[in-house]
UniProtKB/Swiss-Prot annotation:
Source organism (scientific name): Arabidopsis thaliana
Positions in the Cytoplasmic compartment: 1-40
Name this protein carries in UniProt: Xylan glycosyltransferase MUCI21
Chain segments annotated as transmembrane: 41-61
Protein encoded by which gene: MUCI21
Pfam family, one: Glyco_transf_61
UniProt KW Cell inner membrane keyword: no
Length: 494
């Protein structure tokens, strides 16, 4: 049946000189001509019908569609689709391509590469590679991996479920799982567990490593996510759409057998909020290219917001453009590490000549709106914390001032200062003096907590967190901080 339909479909694309021999051809020597005569009569009738439609269509309207061939073509495609769905086979691969290899040399993460007949089985937290190679043992070959990028941090890695990558010899194991969904592009599987929920970790442990790992596929890749969160997809959907043309797969919830020719399990990570061009496989991609991804992701939404604002506040916007005052974006904190004299600092910055926009984002704040503010700002100011990750939204050449509380020097410089410089920002770290810390009122001036914070932080993370992160506020020496703002203003109006 399918062969006959393909012959009919050929009528549509063949030239007329090829059509007639095809329809009227009769074999002179045929031992079974009686059985063939009926199909050839059908061809003749169909051809006559099509020919009459081409000639008399304007008058007789043989079909309600632009062409009679539309119906034939649609029918053929429908039947062929049904046939392909009922006979699903995995993508064919050669023996040389069948392999599992893992790189466990990285300090921050493990990563495994699979090629061949790959099939997922989420109920057993497994991904199978069925091979036609003769294995040297009748035992199943297996790798285990936790696809999260904080390998060295034992406490958090204990919360990440382990995946099994299993090689099976098709000749020895008869439980080859039938493909329910076939993918023609590779998979990248990773976890959004761990510290997901903290902005810094969402970028550092997730999005940037995902970009590093998947970039070479040029969006022709499927993301398979362990510990999937719907809110995470909603929050970063605009960015993910710039990295993949395909829908996400919830590995734990989607019980179907997904089949791939290639898969990467785990992510590459180069460092804190950065892309190391020397480790990229292409032309030396940097963190600036990742920022370009963010710009493409948020640009459509920003353009819509700009149009809406212009319609509502046309006069005010015109006045602001005329003034041409540089914008300073201030990230405001409440609770620990908050600036107790923030209002006075804002007024001082306004007197210097800045337009001030105070940002108080929470988990529900739309990232495109924050990106819009920072992308149009000359200066970003904030106290050390996860919100400083937003420096990625600043244009290269912009000024980033990070206020560094006592005991946070190393973290502030490592997590935000150095990465900001790599992005091309003019980074300035403002290290507060003991008298600018609320701890000054709690401890004697000669106490190591004030006099030698390094001796305290060396005792471990719990001391750093308990004293310097959770129990400290900042009261800026405005005269001292003013010098930094004046310098930033001078640079921003050049």
């Amino acid at each position: 049946m399918r062969q006959n339909l393909k012959k009919v479909a050929q009528i549509k694309v063949d030239e007329s000189k090829k059509l007639f021999p095809y329809v009227f051809r009769v074999k002179t020597s045929c031992g079974n001509c009686a059985k063939r005569s009926k199909p050839k009569l059908i061809y003749l009738l169909i051809f006559s019908l099509i020919s009459s439609c081409f000639v008399f269509a304007p008058q007789l309207l043989c079909f309600p569609y632009p062409s009679a061939l539309f119906l034939i073509d649609s029918s053929i495609k429908e039947i062929e689709n049904r046939v392909s769905e009922s006979n699903i086979e995995s993508p064919k691969t050669s023996q040389k391509e069948e392999s599992i290899s893992c790189d466990r040399t990285g300090y921050r993460s493990d990563i495994c590469f699979m090629k061949g007949d790959i099939r997922t089985h989420s109920p057993s937290s497994s991904i199978f590679l069925y091979t036609s190679n003769d294995l040297t043992t009748d035992q199943v070959l297996q790798e285990k991996i936790k696809p999260y990028t904080r390998k060295w941090e034992t406490s958090i890695m204990e919360t990440i479920p382990e995946l099994k990558l299993v090689t099976k010899d098709m000749k020895l194991f008869g439980d080859k799982r039938k493909c329910e969904v076939i993918h023609e592009v590779p998979a990248v599987l990773f976890s959004t567990g761990g510290y997901t929920g903290n902005l810094y970790h969402e970028f550092n442990d997730g999005l940037i490593p995902l970009y590093i790992t998947s970039k070479r596929f040029n969006k022709k890749v499927v993301f398979v996510i362990a510990e999937y969160h719907k809110w995470w997809e909603m929050k970063y959907g605009d960015v993910l759409s710039q990295l993949s043309d395909y829908s996400l797969i919830d590995f734990n919830k989607d019980k179907r057998t997904h089949c791939f020719k290639e898969a990467i399990v785990g992510l590459r990570i180069h460092g804190e909020l950065t892309v190391d061009p020397s480790q990229m496989q292409d032309d030396g991609t940097t963190i600036n290219e990742f920022r370009n991804v963010l710009d493409r992701a948020y640009r459509p939404r920003i353009n819509r917001l700009d149009r809406l604002e212009e319609q509502r506040f046309h006069a005010r916007l015109a006045q602001r453009r005329k003034a041409k005052r540089p914008k300073l974006a201030l990230f405001s904190r409440t609770g620990s590490r908050g600036i107790t004299n923030e209002d006075l600092m804002v007024k001082m910055a306004q007197r210097i000549g800045f337009d001030i926009e105070v940002l108080r984002p929470d988990r529900t704040t739309e990232l495109a709106k924050i990106y819009r503010v920072l992308n149009s700002s000359k200066v970003m100011v904030g106290v050390h914390g996860a919100a400083m990750t937003h420096f990625l939204f600043m244009k290269p050449g912009s000024i980033f001032i990070q206020i560094i509380p006592l005991g946070t020097d190393w973290a502030a410089e490592t997590y935000y200062g150095e990465p900001a410089k790599k992005l091309g920002l003019d980074y300035n770290g403002y290290k507060i003096l003991p008298r600018e810390s609320s701890l000054y009122e709690k401890y004697d001036k000669d106490d190591p907590i004030l006099k030698d914070p390094n001796s305290i932080t060396k005792k471990g993370w719990q001391f750093t967190k308990g004293i310097y992160l959770n129990d400290q506020k900042v009261r800026l020496d405005l005269h001292r901080f003013k010098k930094l703002l004046i310098d930033a203003y001078a640079k921003s109006i050049r």
